[in-house]
């Protein structure tokens, strides 16, 4: 009887093992093919109406839909996780306190001063040229530099060509820029550019700029049309000069340790959705710019379009500075963005 009972026990165990091998469930109870259940955090510097936050929201919606709700992304605009401090926000994505982020290259300069090479003045003619260069050799440069800081590059989208607004007077010549107190990101490119024009550039957190202009601490700011609109600069600035002096990308990034801890299937999903969100962001920003400029006019801003001769005068005024930037970033970095240094 004992021998017969032992045989029955072995048979039952074998049957359990056979059935478990044929089950559609994985070890953690998920059905085969389901995504892991995880919530990720994503930080952006802009307000919820700015392009970086909109791209992040678009990305989060794609991820949740395609994962069946298993993978979710909580988006935090205004660098809420870092109390509005962009530099601290970047430290958090680098350390893994935040999982995902999107920051402009000039903002990322706090951890790698060689990242914003593509912001050197007047190196791209238009958005199409910028995309062609970045999506060929530029992205490899970004990926390599970010990897050294513990971050994984997932894509880029337009922050926009930077324009100039101020509350003092119309700007048509280099002399018009002299002595203007202009807010710039803390980047060697922007600080140096406005110094070369004789302005008084000041680095300041973006969240403080509107009030500083309102109070007269600043005369103006330089940024893309989209950010200028979403921040309602038309309420405190009377003049806009369209000069496309610098192209800026936002880089979509993940903390590398967090990224490598994810299942391959989840990585594939996030990479796919990030790529689509970046494409959407590029298209959206370009499509909205013309209407936004018309809105500025309706709000009472004087919008100035520079002639070719006026543009040439600005380029001549900063020619020596541009060469300094070519030398600063180096031949390899410049070559990655099609710059003949």
Task: Spell out what each predicted region is.
Residues 23-127, 147-148, 152-341:
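N-terminal secretory/targeting leader peptides
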Residues 125-145:
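A gly/proline- and charged-residue-enriched helix-loop-helix capping module
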Residues 17-21:
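C-terminal motif of bacterial Sec signal peptides marking the signal peptidase cleavage site
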Residues 1-9:
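Bacterial N-terminal signal peptides that target proteins for export
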């Amino acid at each position: 009887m004992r021998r017969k009972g032992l045989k029955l026990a072995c048979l039952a165990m074998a049957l359990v093992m056979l059935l478990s091998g044929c089950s559609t469930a994985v070890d953690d109870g998920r059905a085969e093919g389901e995504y892991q259940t995880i919530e990720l955090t994503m930080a952006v510097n802009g307000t919820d109406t700015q392009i970086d936050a909109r791209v992040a929201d678009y990305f989060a919606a794609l991820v949740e839909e395609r994962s069946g709700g298993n993978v979710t992304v909580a988006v935090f605009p205004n660098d809420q996780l870092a109390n509005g401090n962009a530099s601290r926000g970047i430290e958090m994505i680098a350390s893994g306190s935040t999982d995902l982020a999107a920051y402009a290259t000039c903002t990322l300069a706090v951890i790698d001063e060689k990242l914003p090479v593509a912001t050197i003045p007047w190196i791209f003619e238009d958005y199409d040229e910028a995309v062609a260069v970045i999506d060929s050799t530029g992205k490899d440069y970004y990926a390599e530099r970010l990897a050294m800081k513990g971050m994984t590059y997932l894509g880029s989208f337009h922050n926009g060509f930077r324009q100039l607004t101020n509350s003092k007077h119309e700007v048509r010549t280099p002399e018009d820029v002299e002595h203007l107190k202009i807010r710039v990101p803390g980047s060697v490119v922007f600080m140096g550019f406005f110094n070369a024009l004789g302005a008084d550039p000041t680095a300041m957190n973006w969240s403080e700029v509107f009030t500083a202009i309102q109070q007269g601490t600043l005369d103006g700011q330089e940024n893309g049309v989209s950010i200028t609109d979403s921040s309602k600069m038309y309420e405190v600035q009377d003049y806009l000069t369209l000069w496309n002096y610098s192209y800026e990308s936002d880089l979509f990034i993940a903390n590398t340790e967090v990224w490598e801890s994810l299942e391959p299937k989840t990585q594939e999903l996030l990479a796919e959705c990030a790529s689509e969100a970046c494409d959407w962001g590029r298209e959206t920003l370009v499509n909205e710019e013309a209407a936004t400029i018309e809105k500025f006019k309706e709000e009472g801003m004087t919008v100035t379009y520079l002639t070719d001769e006026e543009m040439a005068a600005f380029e001549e005024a900063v020619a020596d500075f541009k060469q300094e930037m070519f030398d600063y970033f180096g031949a390899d970095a410049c070559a990655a963005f099609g710059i003949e240094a």
